[in-house]
Structure formats: C-alpha cells, structure tokens
Amino acid sequence: MSLTRRDFIKVLGAGSAAGLISGCGSDASAKLASQDNMYEVPKTGNARILHITDTHGNLLPNYFREPNVNLGFGPTYGQLPHVVGNNLLKQIGVKPGSPEAYAFTYNNFEDLAAKYGKTGGFGQIKTVLESLRESAGGVQNTLTLDGGDTWQGSGTSLWTRGADMVEACNMLGVDVMVGHWEFTYKEAETLKNVGFFKGDFLGQNVRILEDALMGDEYATMTEKYDGNGLYSEDDAMPFKPYVIKNVGGHRIAVIGQAFPRTSNANPQKYFFPDWSFGLREDEMQELVTDIRENEKPDAVIVISHNGMDVDIKMASRVVGIDAFFGGHTHDGMPKPVEVKNAGGVTVVTNAGCSGKYIGVMDLNIVDHKVTGYEYKMLPILTDFVKPDAAMVSFISKMRNTKYDKNVVEARSAAMSNNPDRLGKTYDEILTEKLCSTNQTLYRRGNFMGTWDQVLVNSLREEHDADFAMSAGVRWGTSVPAGHDVTMEDLMTNTSMTYGETYVSELKGAQLKEILEGIAENLFVQDPYLQSGGDMVRMGGMDYTIDPA
C-alpha cells in the first residue's frame, strides 16, 4: 500500500530524517506548503551550490533501482562509492525501510517502490530548486550546476536531438554544465544546442584537432552558431574552460571537465571528428593555479563528468580546488568524500542519475576562502512534491508534437525514420503498452541487469544469433515487478543516436580478447585508466571472470 502524505510526514520524523527537511513553511514557498516544506533546507553558509547530473532525458518521474554490486579494487575496495545496500545505510546513518533507504539502495526495492512511488521528474525538480533558492535568500545566493549526460536517454530527447532537454534545463535555471552524451549528436547539432542553452557550457579538457584549425570548414561551421565551438583558436579550445560566478556576493570560479574518454567510448569520426578529449590533469593544475593567482576567487569548484573514482584521484593530486560536483558513474552518494592533498582538503560529491536527486552544498566563505561546508543530497520523491505548472505545461506540449519525416533516429538512412510512427504524437508512441513484467527490470549491476537480459535475448531472437552482446551502460530506468512495460520504458533503455545492431562471426579467441579488453578498461585499479560503466552484457553464453 502506498503512503498518504500524512503518513509520509510521520515517516520522516517531522524533519529529523537525513536529507529531507520538514518545516512549518513560509508564504514564499506556496508550492511546497501542501507537503509542509519537507524539502526546505535552511541556509547554513553564504553561497549555495545546487547540483543535478546524468538525468539522461528523463523529464518525467520514473523508477530507478540502485545497484546491488559496485565493485572497487585496490585503494577503492570497500570505500565510497563502492558500498551498497545495508553497508551503505550504516555508513550514512539511514534507517532501513525509510524514504532515504529506498532512494539510496536497492534494498526491498519492489515493496518500497509501491510504498513511496516514483522518483524524479523535471516538474518536481523545478519546484524543489525554487524552494532551495528561496530558503537561501534568493537565486542570487545560489548557483545551479548540471554534470552532463542530460540531452540523451529518452525517446523525446532522441527525436528532438536534445533540444527538449536544453529548454527544460533553461526553465530549471541551470547556470553551468558540461557534457558527454551531449557530444553524440553531430557537431553542428551540439553547437546549436550550446547556443540555445542560456547558461555556460564548459570544457577545460576538450580540444579542437589541428587539422580542423588548419582548414576553413570548421571555422565556417562555428560562425553559423555565433562562434560557439571556437572559444580560443590559439589554445585550440572549442568551449570556455571556466567561468566566474557571483554567488551571494562571493566570486566563485567554476571549471568544467567533460568526460575525458568520450573519443574512446563514443564514435568520434561520425559525431565529433574535430574534437579530442582527455583527462588533462596537468592542464587542470595549471588552470587552477592561474585562476587562483589572477582571478583571486573566493572559491574554486569543478563541475565534472570524470566519474567519482577519477574525481577522487584528481582531488588528491590537483591543489587548489575546494569541491568536485561529479557525474558519469551515477553514484548517488549522500555522503561526500573529503580528499587530502598537498594544499589541504577537497570535497568530492556525486549526485546519481535520472533526476532522482538534487545535491545541495552550502559553502561558508570568510575572508575570501572556504572555511566550511554542509552537504545534503535530497531524493526527489515524486508523489510528495507538487510539480511546477510551467514545466508540466512545457513537457505536455512537447510530447504532443507529431512524429514526422524530419525525425532522425539513427545514422543509417534506412533506419533513421520509422514510418509506423508518422503522424502520431510523441505521447501516443511512448505510452503504448508492450507487455507486463513479473520480475523487476533494472539496469545497474557490474555484470548484468534484468533489462539487459531482455535486450540481449531479443537481439539473439531477432538476428537468430548464437549469442549477443550489449554495452553495459548505467543509464536506463527500472520497471517494478507487476507493472506494465511501455514504449517509454523501452526507449529510456535504448535511446541513442547510434543504436544500430550488427551480426558478425567471431572465433573463440577473438571473443575472449574482446571480453578481456573490456574488463581491463573497467576493473583496472588505476581510476585514470577506467572507462566507467559496467561489463558488457552477454546473452546465450556464460563466462567466468576474476576482476582482481
């Protein structure tokens, strides 16, 4: 049985539960008044940083089951974020069966999903962000960051080429963002979206290839998009490396770090042939030092798509950064990691995925330096937040768009447009019931998820193959046992701009080499060499592996 709003407040212990605050409310927080301002967080510092990441196109509320396995190796073994289930609850001091336990772990997922409902939704996120800004004394005292992997991951984001998410983020009031899957549209499409975005799109670790700079074609393309994509020709930078923001009267430098392995993980030649990506630790240190010496900021923070292990290592080696706000690895970590380095301590956070959380960090800045902080990660429990009316209206109107011949779903001309969908609205297509499931379908897990099993089994059947492989990505929503599976659910697990499937013959030695190569990228002890994500999914063949 699901909880009533009154029951929910009782479970929260009148505001005592970590990460969710229930209070008496204020006239300025009318939208949250009906649920007693459970998300109103009193300001404890003088600059508030708000953080979302890896929403993967999920404008609507959804279910997302957290992993039951998240292996760490060497120095990361048994350390955050490689702690799950009851062990994580113990570390963060959360009671089993509570709303936070539902949000942060896989424990009793089906029962707690029935009890607490869906999570996320941009209408709900907008409402909570506005409340957090108001409780900080106004938007001028806050800064809203997006860690990327936002413009991809749903049917509507695919069909609009990410434009639906850009507009939604503008409505959220996102000030700064970085990218990864944002680059898996054609370069011109990415630059068009960057121009449409009202905030700052950063990337200190992205470069323009020399061949592109030597010719005229790239420069001509950037001119069409108001110079976006050619921030500094001398430094071969397509995007700003950092921006200075005034937050509560304090100058905060925000550095952007795109996913460093984008060129390895995604098809560079087709989507972004003129750009290169890298970790660029030395350049990061040089940039931080330069900012500290010449800009004289009160704080330096990084909005990062490195992945949490990489952020932790970088924080231990680069001096002068106050905090990392991370993404990529979808680690919903309510407890920050404090990392010691030669210059002091850097705080590392990661705000999960699918619109499930908002990270809130209040910085205390005294005499032009950070002297302390408080951090909360708020789970967005859909049923207990009144959605923002303007956002709901935008989403509804966008979903009422009709699928037409201009929609591009794939690289292949033969598959780029689906004739069966022509003339139907996006909502009509996505709300189609496909089947029901008697077991929970989920994506997260180091070696397999039930959604992945459905996908690889389907590939085997469709192509009459002996076995099938599918990438171990971490994006994709869940469907609890007993629920209907809709086209929306399927699209949130398959929507990418290069989703074509292929059939080929492999010898055993070739297959073994492929699996070992993937495992090496995932489980190597040095975080700088890890690609993130999970092991390739297999159907029709079993294997044994010793990741250590």
Model-inferred region functions:
Residues 1-3, 7:
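Secretory targeting signals
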Residues 2, 357, 505:
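Short aromatic/basic micro-patch
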Residues 40-49, 53-62, 115, 137-144, ...:
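Solvent-exposed loop/linker segments at secondary-structure transitions
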